[in-house]
Amino acid sequence: MSKAVGIDLGTTYSCVAHFANDRVEIIANDQGNRTTPSFVAFTDTERLIGDAAKNQAAMNPANTVFDAKRLIGRKFDDHEVQGDIKHFPFKVVDKASKPMIQVEYKGETKTFSPEEISSMILGKMKETAEGFLGTTVKDAVVTVPAYFNDSQRQATKDAGTIAGLNVMRIINEPTAAAIAYGLDKKSEAEKNVLIFDLGGGTFDVSLLSIEDGIFEVKATAGDTHLGGEDFDNRLVNFFIQEFKRKNKKDISTNQRALRRLRTACERAKRTLSSSAQTSIEIDSLYEGIDFYTSITRARFEELCADLFRSTLEPVDKVLSDAKIDKSKVDEIVLVGGSTRIPKVQKLVSDYFNGKEPNRSINPDEAVAYGAAVQAAILSGDTSSKTQDLLLLDVAPLSLGIETAGGIMTKLIPRNSTIPTKKSETFSTYADNQPGVLIQVFEGERAQTKDNNLLGKFELSGIPPAPRGVPQIEVTFDIDANGILNVSALEKGTGKTQKITITNDKGRLSKEEIEKMVSEAEKFKEEDEKEASRVQAKNQLESYAYSLKNTLGEEQFKSKLDASEIEEVTKAADETISWLDANQTATQEEFADQQKELESKANPIMTKAYQAGATPSGAAGAAPGGFPGGAAPEPSNDGPTVEEVD
């Protein structure tokens, strides 16, 4: 049975789950947390992912990368990307019209694509799952916002490939959450369920009908750039102004102060979901000035009022697209951490005439939960829970080609069930036209210039004929991941041409992906090497200190000459001084130092043991070898306790 997992790759937090024995297990990371911050940090010595990266963000803001999901599959000059760059403490540069993230790592300037950063987070989730399942994990279902377009989906799939995963399927987050909601409610009559998913960076609304294990998405809408981060930004800007007013100083250029303020704002926002008021206390925020202030829930709601209200537009759109009156919605399911905000809950409830939302699923874990169920189905799990489950999802945006006059001619309207295939016949615009340029767009506007160009290709070699005579059949084929293939066939000659829309301009080529896969493996090796180096250092340090402690005990003093004790103590002190001066030494150097110290200490310690001394510490504190035994090699199972920063 392959160990397939479901991964919710979130803007701010990610989560991984596994389905086995008729139930879903949300897998906790090495810190015991069931969600992992989507942060990657680069330092002079190592790369950190998850909690460790987020915890050091204030000390290293320029090299701590987050929100990669807000960049993935977008172009550098996208106005939302430009807006985000203003807030980011790390550097985003333009490379072939694609946003690339620039950081300092081990003293060198490195450039990473958003796919690579996302792949590091996916790799971390993969490791988390492997630690729990005790086996290698290859297959995964990865989720994306329902409103992600073709290039964003393709880029997310590429990130999975770079992380060494086989992405079995890309599924929409609200659909995954609907599975989490409906898995145990199979036998009930048909229900219309509205999923309202407001996360850290994206917002989706989907309306599904659930009946007898069939989950059919009727319509979907959303905003791929609205979430908790935007609420944090409002708080941060508000407090920057307050600090300016009180202290006549502008902290907006100091990245470290901003990061500390943002962390405090995020915490305050969470507190305001359960309290009416909270205080913010940051010591020495800027130029030694302490920042103590407070904020009420009412003020927070006022700061974000327009953002909160804007969440109802997609709800309207979904209901009108699905041609369903709001009174016909049986359940409203809230997903995503931001739906804990009381004002958001109230807006939704009021919109549905006072109907209370369903709170039966965990908003942080529901998406990974549903993805894990889908992963189990795709890998052939035979559980009674999953066997009759069928997912019917939709394409979020209309797809079509440009026809004469820059008109968008739609082949697949939005909210068409996928997978789907649609053909239409077109002809030439001029007499004796030798070829046609087929340009593929997605979007809802009448003119192609207002929509998003996905890709284009040429069908040439059309025999000379009057306009309107040649018949060119264009076929659009959307697969289950929501990714598009387009082909064109000239019926007279049988000439055919096809492309998978892989957004030629922004998409990584096969070679680039392969290069990134090998780089990802190299980074992983470096991470492991650094971990072994730190372990060797800790082992040497604990050995030197344990020697000193042991020699300080009375019973040892009585069994050994003062000169012997002094000799070993001096050697241990020298090692400790060497350690202080050489924190960045290699694993081999630490091992050599340990051998050297052992060669001085072992004969003397052995003599003490033969004379009957036993240390009062734990047995493990007995340094060196036992009588007649050789000194133990510094093994890799040394201290398993780490320092706390």
Swiss-Prot record:
Alphabetic keyword roster: Acetylation, ATP-binding, Cell wall, Cytoplasm, Nucleotide-binding, Secreted, Stress response
Loss of function: phenotype: Does not affect cells growth and hyphal formation. Leads to high resistance to the candidacidal activity of Hst 5.
Induction statement: Expression is repressed by treatment with caspofungin.
Annotated positions of the N-acetylserine modification: 2
GO biological process, one term: protein refolding
Compartment(s) of residence: Cytoplasm; Secreted, Cell wall
Biased composition range(s): Low complexity: 611-621
Region (Disordered): 581-645
Gene Ontology annotations for the cellular component aspect, listed alphabetically: cell surface; cytoplasm; cytosol; extracellular region; fungal biofilm matrix; fungal-type cell wall; hyphal cell wall; membrane
Pfam name, any one: HSP70
SUPFAM superfamilies listed in its UniProt record: Actin-like ATPase domain, Heat shock protein 70kD (HSP70), C-terminal subdomain, Heat shock protein 70kD (HSP70), peptide-binding domain
Gene Ontology MF terms: ATP binding; ATP hydrolysis activity; ATP-dependent protein folding chaperone; heat shock protein binding; peptide binding; protein folding chaperone
Quaternary structure (record): Binds human histatin-5, an antifungal peptide from saliva.
Domain remarks: The regions defined by residues 128 to 135, 150 to 156 and 333 to 337 correspond to Hst 5-binding epitopes.
Role of this protein: Heat shock protein that may play a role in the transport of polypeptides both across the mitochondrial membranes and into the endoplasmic reticulum.
Family to which this protein belongs: Belongs to the heat shock protein 70 family.
PANTHER family in alphabetical order: HEAT SHOCK PROTEIN 70KDA
Protein's name according to its UniProt entry: Heat shock protein SSA2
Organism the protein comes from: Candida albicans (strain SC5314 / ATCC MYA-2876) (Yeast)
Gene: SSA2
